[in-house]
């Protein structure tokens, strides 16, 4: 089912990069027993995420992390005391006062329990992923939000500060809050990973992936216009690959007209419409 949904979401949205999974490895013996290649270098966590999106599956532990903030966000090391006080962020001259810096720090997600390592790779290759992450442009993000609201209503756990865009916004946050989040990323990951200017990220707990995919597809025919539907059709190997056929003859703009025209609505209320 996971492989099918990865394919369906990728083709429905036209994603440029692979959807990846992140699995948290709590114990050393669990990490050692996992028979996937070790990352073998020391970089930022967001560079690991991009490496996974390039069709690589691997595991990494504390020694592979160059970014202190990611280590703490993902639970691989304890926070320094300067974190909760806001001193770390205030020292960067990104916030007007220590109070603002402390408030921002408080709301940046961090996994509280100790974690030994992580496994990353294309989602279809991870048996027990905890979080799914993928990159989108603005139109694709609109469709993700529409798919989410189809299933769960308006997202109520969205948060970002323009910092720690991958480690906190897309990984720790969805896991800790048990809900989808999206992020405009941060300057650090945009520089190191060379994301395109129009790219943003989506992270969600793994159990939301299948229903989110379904929500995106169930709203496709009613929201996407013929131009987008043509592009979707071109990506498909089979007309029923998404589970529903692409239909250029329907659109939500053609529906519900009695509910936007007062005079027609009166007829509806009075039983005068067939």
Task: Provide a role label for each language-model segment.
Residues 3-274:
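Acidic, serine/proline-rich low-complexity intrinsically disordered regions
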């Amino acid at each position: 089912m996971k492989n099918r949904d990865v394919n369906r979401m990728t083709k429905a949205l036209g994603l440029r990069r692979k959807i990846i999974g992140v699995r948290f490895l709590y114990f050393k013996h669990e990490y050692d027993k996992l028979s996937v290649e070790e990352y073998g270098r020391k970089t930022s966590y967001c560079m690991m995420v991009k490496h996974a999106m390039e069709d690589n599956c691997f595991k990494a532990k504390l020694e592979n992390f160059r970014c202190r903030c990611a280590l703490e966000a993902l639970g691989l090391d304890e926070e320094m005391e300067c974190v909760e006080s806001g001193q770390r962020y205030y020292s960067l001259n990104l916030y007007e006062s220590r109070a603002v810096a402390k408030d921002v720090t408080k709301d940046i997600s961090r996994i509280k329990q100790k974690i030994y390592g992580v496994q990353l790779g294309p989602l279809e290759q991870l048996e027990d992923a905890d979080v799914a992450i993928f990159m989108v442009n603005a139109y694709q993000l609109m469709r993700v939000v529409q798919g989410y609201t189809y299933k769960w209503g308006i997202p109520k756990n969205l948060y970002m500060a323009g910092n720690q865009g991958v480690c906190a916004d897309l990984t720790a946050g969805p896991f800790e809050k048990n809900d989808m989040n999206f992020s405009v990323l941060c300057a650090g990951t945009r520089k190191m990973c060379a994301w395109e200017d129009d790219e943003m990220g989506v992270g969600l707990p793994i159990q939301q992936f299948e229903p989110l995919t379904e929500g995106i597809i169930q709203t496709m025919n009613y929201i996407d216009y013929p131009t987008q539907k043509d592009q979707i059709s071109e990506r498909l190997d089979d007309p029923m690959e998404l589970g529903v056929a692409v239909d250029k003859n329907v659109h939500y703009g053609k529906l519900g007209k009695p509910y936007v025209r007062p005079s027609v609505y009166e007829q509806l209320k009075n039983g005068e419409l067939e």
